[in-house]
Amino acid sequence: MADNTPTTANDFLNGAAQVAKSPEEIAKENDLLPKLITHLDRHLIFPLLQFVADQDEEPSPEITKAKFELLKKTNMTDYVASLYCEIEGVEEPPKEYATKRQEILQRLEIFGQESEKITDLLGREDVVTGLRSDKVANLEFLKKEHDVTIDMVNVLYDFGNFQYSCGNYGAAAELLYQFRVLSTDDDKVTAATWGKLACEILTGNWESAMEEVQKVKELIETKLFNKPVAQLNHRTWLIHWALFPFFNHEPARDVICDLFFSPAFINTIQTACPWILRYLTAAVITNRNRTRNTGQYQKQLKDIIRIVKQENYEYSDPVTDFIKALYLDFDFEEAQKKLSEAEEVLRSDFFLVAASENFVEAARHLISESYCKIHQRIDIKDLSARLGLNQDEGEKWIVNLIRDTRVDAKIDYKEGTVVMNHPPSSVYQQVIERTKGGFFRTQVLSAAVAK
């Protein structure tokens, strides 16, 4: 038999206390690190682990162990040895680390000797000017004029990989570039292109990284044309790698937004990695403050609303839920709640932490614009609360909003309201107003029945 005991105020308060989550709980629940690392090279994972470590006041043994496991198979022996000492609480690492260090130094010297001739040639202007876009012709030219062999070219690839494993990303990028100029081995050229992209990311050369993103995209489209599963997997990896320039290089924002919204890539996101919607949504929202092309911005906003709606059953977090609350449910209180949660999520996300303030600013604009569209007279105190601001801050915010957007409105400081001079009601507004009216009548009837 159902329990018909009336719900008391204390029950509501206790329920609210159980539902309320701390910022740390919100961040932990929405941590994407486990999903991201499965699509990143181990060297690209390291900055994400370091970010987590930097957020902790005290060094975390778990993060230190994770770093050790991540890098122990690389040639970064000195750093791995220091991690070992930290984990085990000793001052000196085992002798095997010193032995491995010596082996690595010897191998570097051998690689240097084996590649010296070809790297010197590629550094000479007279040789470089003789090269053409035809790799076969280039090899013939170098073989005929300078006795260069295929083995010499392949040494560049092996040396580049070795330098990468040592953490010498600048040197690795140059070697892989030189290899790519000469090699006709498709598989190795593809691997070298991915490797150079990783190097440019890890050295923060964002313009070069964007060039490599485009090269990898072209390789996926051409070399894997008849392999749809391989294309899907490679696009998934590229999407994750592209997050680095996406939020670190301002000119990359529009380019990567366009890339992610392209049919092949948005299909990949929806099929293989829907959590990327967090980053695409954040990028679209923050674009409000930086784009001059309002038409493009409105299109991207409509697209992200549609995609969030489609994928809500598959993936959601406070960032995508903000879009859902504001544009699909028209629930301003829920939108404000999700904005507060989204701010915590962004602050704990390696890729989005630098965009958190711009995101909140742009999101408040979107709430204000939507709220103003469906109300004739707006209480400043009420709107301020919906924006998470006090009344003074809210008043300044609304003044700036009216000035920046040139909306036709007047502030009545005496009444503490904003009067909107709307054009004749749109269908959108009529539906909202009728819904509000129906909700009000339902409340009145419920109150009457309760009496």
From Swiss-Prot:
Q: Give the record's keywords alphabetically.
A: Cytoplasm, Initiation factor, Protein biosynthesis
Major place of residence: cytoplasm
Pfam families given for it?
eIF3_N, EIF3E_C, PCI
Any single GO molecular-function term of the entry would be:
translation initiation factor activity
Give a Gene Ontology cellular component term annotated to this protein: nucleus
Query: Does the UniProt entry include the keyword Cytoplasm?
Result: yes
Q: Indicate yes or no for the key word Cytoplasm.
A: yes
Q: Give the location in the cell.
A: Cytoplasm
Record-linked SUPFAM superfamilies? Winged helix' DNA-binding domain
Kindly give the Gene3D superfamilies that the UniProt entry links to this protein. Answer: 1.25.40.570
Q: Which SMART domains match?
A: eIF3_N, PINT
Q: Where is the PCI domain?
A: 245-425
| One biological process term in Gene Ontology | translational initiation
Oligomeric form and interacting partners: Component of the eukaryotic translation initiation factor 3 (eIF-3) complex.
The entry's function note states: Component of the eukaryotic translation initiation factor 3 (eIF-3) complex, which is involved in protein synthesis of a specialized repertoire of mRNAs and, together with other initiation factors, stimulates binding of mRNA and methionyl-tRNAi to the 40S ribosome. The eIF-3 complex specifically targets and initiates translation of a subset of mRNAs involved in cell proliferation.
The record's family statement is:
Belongs to the eIF-3 subunit E family.
Q: Tell me the protein's name.
A: Eukaryotic translation initiation factor 3 subunit E
